[in-house]
Amino acid sequence: MELDVFAGQEKSELSMIEVARAILETRGRDKEMYFNDLVNEIQNYLEKSDADIRSSLPFFYSDLNTDGSFIPLGDNKWGLRSWYAIDEIDEEVITLEDIDENAPKRKNKKVNAFMDGDEDAIDYNDDDPEDENFTPSSAILEYDNDNEDDENAEVESYDSELNEIIPDDDLDDVELSEEDDDDDDDYEDETND
């Protein structure tokens, strides 16, 4: 078998993936090949031994999967992606309709690197089962139900505690007067300069 694409090139310099592409292109559209047949054709063209092909087979298969120009067609058949229109390619597509909105959502499990598989250790990052039922509406505190008498009692007890620290009689004796402060004058002098 001769491939016109590689005329004038040494076969030892060609990669298996290049030869596979050329073989499939010469066969034409809708002439996909089984993987084993493709490898045999490549081996015959490159004139490589069985041992050489076996050693490079994993790399070739990886290249075949990652190269964007090849497409697996099922049953270990391979073809060129250019042979098929986008509409013909049967790939799994997840749409919003496929997602069940009522399905229970799974929580991501946090991994604690410091636990070391100790089953007796307490994982404080574990969620409390009561937290799962927590809703913001249950957290709203109602202040309207407070008793005004309780509030007045609190204010009176606070006032009595303050009176213990400073009696009301002493507050009347304190005179507030404005002192002359030299620092204020110094500040005014600095700002006027």
Curated annotation (Swiss-Prot):
Entry keyword Magnesium: no
What's the protein here called?
A: Probable DNA-directed RNA polymerase subunit delta
Q: Function, please?
A: Participates in both the initiation and recycling phases of transcription. In the presence of the delta subunit, RNAP displays an increased specificity of transcription, a decreased affinity for nucleic acids, and an increased efficiency of RNA synthesis because of enhanced recycling.
Q: Which InterPro entries does the annotation name?
A: Asxl_HARE-HTH, RNAP_delta_N_dom_sf, RpoE
Gene Ontology BP, a term = regulation of DNA-templated transcription
Biased composition range(s): Acidic residues: 119-133, 143-193
Q: Which organism is it from?
A: Streptococcus thermophilus (strain ATCC BAA-250 / LMG 18311)
> What does the sequence similarity comment in the record state about its family?
Belongs to the RpoE family.
Q: Which residues form the HTH HARE-type domain?
A: 14-83
**Subunit notes for this chain?**
RNAP is composed of a core of 2 alpha, a beta and a beta' subunits. The core is associated with a delta subunit and one of several sigma factors.
